[in-house]
UniProtKB/Swiss-Prot annotation:
Pathway(s) the chain acts in: Cell wall biogenesis; peptidoglycan recycling
Gene: nagZ
Catalytic EC class: hydrolase
Enzyme Commission designation: 3.2.1.52
Annotated binding of substrate, by residue: D62, R70, R133, K163, H164
UniProt GO molecular function: beta-N-acetylhexosaminidase activity
Major location (coarse): cytoplasm
Name of the protein: Beta-hexosaminidase
Species annotation: Haemophilus influenzae (strain 86-028NP)
Function statement: Plays a role in peptidoglycan recycling by cleaving the terminal beta-1,4-linked N-acetylglucosamine (GlcNAc) from peptide-linked peptidoglycan fragments, giving rise to free GlcNAc, anhydro-N-acetylmuramic acid and anhydro-N-acetylmuramic acid-linked peptides.
UniProt catalytic activity: Hydrolysis of terminal non-reducing N-acetyl-D-hexosamine residues in N-acetyl-beta-D-hexosaminides
Length: 351
């Protein structure tokens, strides 16, 4: 049973990485800025992975836009999600959100990447880890922009991943560095933070969801990423979500309360995650591969494997054809202009 997504150390594929990626438990990999030099190099790296690993691998990246954009030189400068609301009219916002989703997905698919983990559905901009990655603090605006962004992704042929369930926007701590605690009342979380996820699930817009490494103290004692309450009771049963559940990176400090890497993996799977990310922890990956025992007799084996298949890219796009496309050319200029205006607004605030 394939369940783990791992990372690569550098810009070239190492033999050890071929062996790790070939392990039956490994479902795919996630790419980072450290793997990127330029477009030709990253395409060659991906081609090498596809050729040397003799099984289908889900290749992923965080190419959200704004400050979370792993590939920059030679690619469209995608706006931060907050930039749409801050720089555009109401009509322009939804139009350009859709174009940003399409542009991002088309460029990644042209590299032979299956999935970019997007969009962020957290509300508000106060959390250090989220900030301008959030569309808005207003539920209606965030949902409207997210729908259009996802429609653009789907049009290009990429699945969507809503994150970070049930909402990371109202904790100041960064789960990359520590485990955040959100002690707000359950009614507030359900009536506000959860709404983008609930509404997008009801409209069948989300192919996957990534829960937060946040403990919501009035609801459960475990981080959402390792919580049966959040993933089985709320996400699967109450919201009737049928797509894939990714863990956020189990190498993050925010996941540390769940134990060592093997324990974190087991807890996330038992809580309801289908696929696990473990990054920047090569020894941790090896520990998990050596000690996590999953078989085809697992109760959710068939459902999990079916969900994995639904995440692979649904189109073939050639880079040389893409850059001749008038839609791409127009977006390439307009989206960069939106981000430039947003950066100017931020700079003026800081003066």
């Amino acid at each position: 049973m394939s369940t783990l997504l791992i990372d690569l150390k550098g810009k070239e594929l190492e033999q050890e990485e071929v062996e790790l990626l070939s392990h039956p438990l490994v479902a795919g990999l996630i790419l980072f800025t450290r793997n990127f030099e330029d477009r030709e190099q990253i395409q060659e790296l991906i081609r090498s992975v596809r050729q040397r690993v003799k099984k289908p691998l889900l290749i992923t990246v965080d190419q959200e836009g704004g400050r979370v954009q792993r590939f920059r030189d030679g690619f469209t400068m995608l706006p931060s999600m907050q930039a749409f609301q801050e720089t555009l009219s109401a009509t322009e916002q939804v139009s350009f959100a859709k174009e940003a989703g399409w542009q991002m997905a088309a460029e990644m698919i042209a590299l032979d990447i299956d999935l970019s983990f997007a969009p962020v559905l957290d509300l508000g901009h106060e959390c250090r880890a989220i900030g301008d990655r959030s569309f808005s603090s207003d539920v209606k605006s965030a949902v409207n922009l997210a729908i259009n962004f996802i429609d653009g992704m789907h049009q290009a042929g990429m699945a969507s991943t809503g994150k970070h369930f049930p909402g990371h926007g109202h904790v100041l701590a960064d789960s990359h560095l520590e485990t955040p605690y959100d002690d707000r009342a359950k009614d507030e979380i359900f009536g506000y933070d959860l709404q983008p996820f609930q509404q997008l699930i009801s409209q069948n817009k989300l192919d996957a969801i990534m829960p937060a490494h946040v403990i919501y103290g009035q609801c459960d004692s475990q981080p959402a990423s390792g919580s049966e309450y959040w993933l089985k009771e709320i996400l699967r049963k109450k919201l009737n979500f049928q797509g894939t559940i990714f863990s956020d990176d189990l190498g993050m400090k925010g996941a540390g309360v769940m134990g060592n890497f093997v324990e974190r993996s087991k807890k996330a799977l038992n809580a309801g995650c289908d696929l696990l990310l473990l990054c920047n922890e090569r020894e941790g990956v090896i520990q998990v591969l050596d000690n996590l025992k999953l078989t085809e007799n697992e109760p959710h084996f068939m459902a999990r494997q079916a969900r994995l298949k639904n995440l692979f890219k649904r189109s073939v796009i050639e880079w040389n054809d893409l850059v001749l496309d008038q839609r791409w050319k127009l977006n390439h200029r307009n989206l960069a202009d939106i981000q430039s205006r947003w950066l100017d607004i931020q700079a003026a605030k800081n003066d």
